[in-house]
Amino acid sequence: ALGVVSPEDKEIKSVEELKGKTLIIAKGTTAETYFEKNHPEVKLQKYDAYADAYNALLDGRGDAFSTDNTEVIAWAKTNPGYVVGIETLGDYDTIAAAVAKGNTELLDFLNEEIRELGKENFFHKDYEETLKPVFGDDTDPDSIVVEGGEAGKN
């Protein structure tokens, strides 16, 4: 899913609040596709590189920045004065291993391992140990972690 980060003193909490404002995005990203398709009324300011996009937000060239929620949540934690007002927006996109078409043996093996790890709540436990120190207490692990191969499930 996408997230939207903005200055704390001008927090954007809904897509409706982006009307009349400038949203910074990186070119060729899911954020660009999502906003062009679903919210053409939002003015987009596009950058070729993420560093340029974040610098544009820091410099005040736009009102907010949108990209993958995991990225904006972590960025806001390390940049005081910024907050993620929209933590989950659009489709849940997952970053996961891929298997070549036709390799059913490997696919079946991985799917079974993921199901078994899900029964142990492995991914949430791993989140607590590795990612929670980055994202903090106020981030919902279910907005980041897929457990047992099913989004939004514990």
Give the label of every model feature segment.
Residues 10, 27-30, 45-59:
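Short helix-initiation/N-cap motifs at beta->coil->alpha
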Residues 14, 31, 49-53, 68-72, ...:
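Stable alpha-helical elements in mature extracytoplasmic
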Residues 6-23:
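Flexible hinge/capping segments at coil-to-helix
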Residues 1-6, 73-114, 134-153:
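Periplasmic-binding protein-like
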Residues 3-5, 22-26, 44-46, 64-67, ...:
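Structural recognition of the beta-strand scaffold that forms the well-ordered cores
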